[in-house]
Design a protein with these regions (language model features):
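Long, low-complexity intrinsically disordered regions
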Residues: 63-77
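Basic/aromatic-rich interaction segments and small domains that mediate binding to polyanionic partners
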Residues: 2-66
Length: 77
């Protein structure tokens, strides 16, 4: 079950907004009917996107995972 403030991982690419599978976000709102709003930020704290996603598009973080940094395309932000 996904709850507000959970850290989640994007399960598939969202090319229209420059997000890739594996990007990490924070749940900022859970919709009663299903789905949630997830905020994706740079490591510097800049919000890239707040996206409405279904739970199928997300997965919880796993205890044996490590974050990976990547450069974002400035034209998509």
């Amino acid at each position: 079950m996904i709850r507000e403030h959970d850290t989640v991982v994007l399960a598939s690419d969202l090319p229209d907004i420059g997000l890739k599978a594996g990007d990490v976000g924070t749940v900022v709102l859970v919709h009663p009917a299903g789905g949630c709003e997830v905020e994706f930020m740079t490591l510097g704290g800049e919000t890239l996107a707040v996206v409405s996603l279904s739970v199928e598009q997300l997965r919880p973080i796993r205890t044996r995972e490590i974050a990976h940094a990547r450069q974002i395309d400035q034209t998509q932000h």
